[in-house]
Amino acid sequence: MEGKYSLDKGLWIYGDIGTGKSSLMQIFSEYMKLEFNGFKLHICNGIANAYSVSGDLDLYTYNQHGYIGKPVWMCFDELGREAIPANHFGTKLNVMQHILHIRYSLWQSSRLKTFVTTNCDPFQIESLYGDFIRDRIREMFNVILVEGNSRRQ
């Protein structure tokens, strides 16, 4: 992936626990607010829990009823830590697979950026979300591996 980064893509930051992926994304989000509208970070576990309660994922996909009434840049933090599937009154859904599928379509049509942090490697992503999602990661994202020991104390 060296030398093949693109400003048209979002970021996919992955690596071991505690290496600073979420902190990097929070800093990047704050910086982007100075230049553009920025973006919010949403913890994937919270998204799955919200689906279990309301059954609604519009905010994270087409956003017709939230923010500014259209899709916006967004970061999904801690992908792979959410319940799979989430259950809304008997309707089971792999929430993040569904969201990433829609965000891919939005990226194709309008280059809408999505950002992700995860501890999962590409093989784990395929096992959790399928080959369709894994296959599109490099097309939609600049992939960055963050290595090192945990920085938590």
Question: Where are the model-predicted features located?
Answer:
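Phosphate-binding P-loop
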Residues: M1-D8
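Short coil/turn segments at beta-strand junctions that form active-site/ligand-binding loops
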Residues: K9, K70-P71, L112
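Motif I (Walker A/P-loop) of helicase-class P-loop NTPases
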Residues: M25-S29
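AAA+/P-loop NTPase substrate/partner-engagement loops
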Residues: E30-M74
